[in-house]
A protein has these predicted regions:
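Anionic-ligand binding patches
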Residues: 2-5, 11-205
Length: 205
């Protein structure tokens, strides 16, 4: 079975992508011996996702590995604060998830419009270099305090319009059904399914 390299060390992302791509087999960056620091200096989620995918793809090719690569970049965009934290979501405060959430909530003190969305750009690069880019968005509001599980990102302060609860309150299945990452990744999975990627060799796609 042909495998896919995931261009991330974030275990939460890895777990979510594995749930979306049921029956597919994956390799992590550690599995392939990739230990470079990828500089994410783009101005958009799309640019950063492409950078990660291309750097890892180049490494995969150099190691003569017959694998596709999937990367993504994603984050929270809050309308009232000029769509911050945006591409800086993971390092917004410099103090990790708790600090990031606190900074968003502090910036929204006294503000009524708490409209926000989660955005993801996902990139697939096939072994021959064919590249596919997909976007996913899911809309909601920022709560005034943390609600639900606090273990991942902004989930406990992002109230999903579709679910009627925060991502921190949602079950894994509920979140996967509406998440920005799931929306972006599903067309990539559909493409790989359509070419029977798991059963192909290089000459067949």
């Amino acid at each position: 079975m042909r495998k896919i390299v995931l261009a991330t060390n974030n275990q939460h992302k890895i777990n979510e992508i594995k749930r979306i791509f049921k029956l597919y087999q994956f390799l992590t960056l550690k599995d392939i011996g990739f230990d470079q620091d990828i500089v994410e200096d783009g101005f958009t989620f799309e640019e950063n996702a492409l950078t990660k995918a291309r750097v890892v793809h180049d490494y995969v090719v150099s190691q003569k590995l017959d694998c596709a690569v999937i990367a993504d970049d994603s984050g929270l965009c809050v309308k009232a604060i000029n769509y911050e934290p945006g591409i800086y979501s993971a390092r917004y405060s410099g103090l990790g998830d708790e600090g990031n959430r606190k900074k968003v909530l502090e910036k929204l003190l006294g503000i009524q419009d708490r409209t926000a969305y989660m955005q993801c750009y996902a990139v697939l690069i096939m072994p021959d270099g064919y590249t596919m880019i997909q976007e996913g968005k899911t809309y909601g509001l920022i709560t005034k305090s943390k609600i639900g599980d606090e273990s991942f990102g902004y989930d406990c302060i992002f109230w999903s319009n579709k679910l009627g609860k925060t991502f921190g309150q949602a079950s894994i299945e509920e979140k996967d059904s509406v998440s920005h990452r799931s929306i972006a990744m599903k067309p990539i999975k559909e493409y790989l399914d359509s070419i029977n990627y798991r059963g192909l060799d290089d000459s067949e796609y």
